[in-house]
Structure formats: structure tokens, C-alpha cells
Design a protein with these regions (language model features):
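Short cysteine clusters
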Residues: 138
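Bacterial N-terminal signal peptides that target proteins for export
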Residues: 1-10
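Cys-dependent protein tyrosine phosphatase-like superfamily
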Residues: 14-134, 147-208
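Glycine/aspartate-rich loop-and-adjacent alpha/beta segment that forms the canonical ThDP
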Residues: 144
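Substrate/cofactor-recognition hotspot
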Residues: 141
Length: 208
């Protein structure tokens, strides 16, 4: 084997080793820097159900025995973000309250972003923990619910908007139809810093 060829082979082997090492380092850094998204759980009667943490859960509107399943999980507060089909909302309210579950409706359009008063109400519920286990839902569990969970992640857990949007997409957020929601999430850190209605939630973090 010529000296030049041996040198070339050595350089290739060295470059490969460096590339593999860098790739492993990048994966390790991603594992450290990327927070865990909500754990998806199979709950009868509720699609796209996710456990955000020990006191906060998300999903689509409960169907069938869905509310009873929430009771079994220890959920004592339901936050309903639907603003449409008032009859369905009232039916769910009656079912929840008959089981001793607190029911709160923060009505909004499936095409609109959240307003400050709704976010403040939701954040106030979070502050009440550990006395409460909260389930938040909209119609399908991806858009409005994802937006509120993103707000929680940013305000209480220090996530970046990009990380929060990534979690939204993992729960079927329809960006094509609702790009305004992702834009709202991206602007949220600055909005939290300047909104008078959200002043008491600045630099807040959930306790472990």
C-alpha cells in the first residue's frame, strides 16, 4: 500500500470517527435540552388524551363514559374551551357536576386565539394545585387545547415557543388551518412581559 493511499484511508477513518462522535454529542444535547412532551394515554371516551404532568391533563371532548373515566383518574376540574354547541356543553356540565367534578367553560372560537382574561383564569387554576387535577379540552383536543397548554409550558415551565409548538403538533395541531395560533404562541413571551392582565404570572414556575 502506498504512503499516499494509507494517509487517505487514515483521514477517512478519522473523519468518520469525528462525525460519529459529533452526531452522538448532538443527540445527547437534544436529549438534555428537549423537554418531554405530554404522555399519550389511552382513555376510553376521550381521544388525544395526554398527561402533561401529575396535575394537568389534556384531550378532546369526552364522549360516552369519558367524564366517568376522568373521575376514575382523580380529575376534579374540567376546563372546557368550546364556545359552540351550547347544549353539549351543558350536558357535560351536568354530568361532571353529578360526579363532583368542577366544570369551567372558557368559551372561544376554534378559529381565534385566547384572550388575556381566559389565560389568566386558566393560570389561576394552575396556581391552586396541588388541590386540583385539571383536564382541559376543546372539540378535537389539538388546537385550542394545544394553545392553552403551550401558554402553560412557556409561563410555568420556561419552555421556548418552538418547544411548545412542537408539542402542539404532536397532538394534531392543524397549523394549515390555524396558523394564527402558532403566531400567538411565538409572541407569548413578549406578551407576558407587557400585558397588565397577566402581570401576576410573569416569571412564575410550577413547583416540583
Amino acid at each position: 500500500m502506498s504512503a499516499n493511499r494509507a494517509t487517505a484511508i487514515a483521514l477517512v477513518l478519522f473523519s468518520t470517527a469525528v462525525a460519529v462522535g459529533c452526531s452522538a454529542h448532538r443527540k445527547q444535547m437534544l436529549a438534555v435540552n428537549s423537554p418531554g412532551i405530554a404522555e399519550k394515554i389511552d382513555v376510553p371516551g376521550i381521544s388525544d388524551f395526554g398527561k402533561v404532568n401529575d396535575f394537568l391533563y389534556r384531550g378532546a371532548q369526552p364522549r360516552g363514559d369519558g367524564v366517568e373515566e376522568l373521575k376514575k383518574l382523580g380529575i376534579d376540574t374540567i376546563v372546557d374551551l368550546r364556545g359552540e354547541l351550547h347544549g353539549l356543553i351543558e350536558n357535560e356540565r351536568q354530568q361532571a357536576e353529578s360526579l363532583g367534578i368542577r366544570f369551567i367553560n372558557l368559551p372561544g372560537s376554534g378559529w381565534a386565539t385566547a384572550d388575556d382574561e381566559q389565560i389568566a383564569q386558566f393560570f389561576s387554576l394552575i396556581r391552586e394545585r396541588p388541590r386540583r387535577k385539571i383536564f382541559i379540552h376543546c372539540w378535537l383536543g389539538g388546537d385550542r387545547s394545544g394553545m392553552f397548554i403551550a401558554a402553560y409550558r412557556i409561563a410555568f415551565e420556561g419552555w421556548s415557543p418552538e418547544q411548545a409548538i412542537q408539542e402542539m403538533r404532536s397532538f394534531h395541531y392543524l397549523h394549515f388551518w390555524h396558523p394564527n395560533m402558532a403566531r400567538w404562541v411565538k409572541r407569548l413571551p413578549d406578551h407576558l412581559a407587557h400585558s397588565p392582565k397577566l402581570a401576576s404570572f410573569r416569571q412564575v414556575r410550577a413547583q416540583p
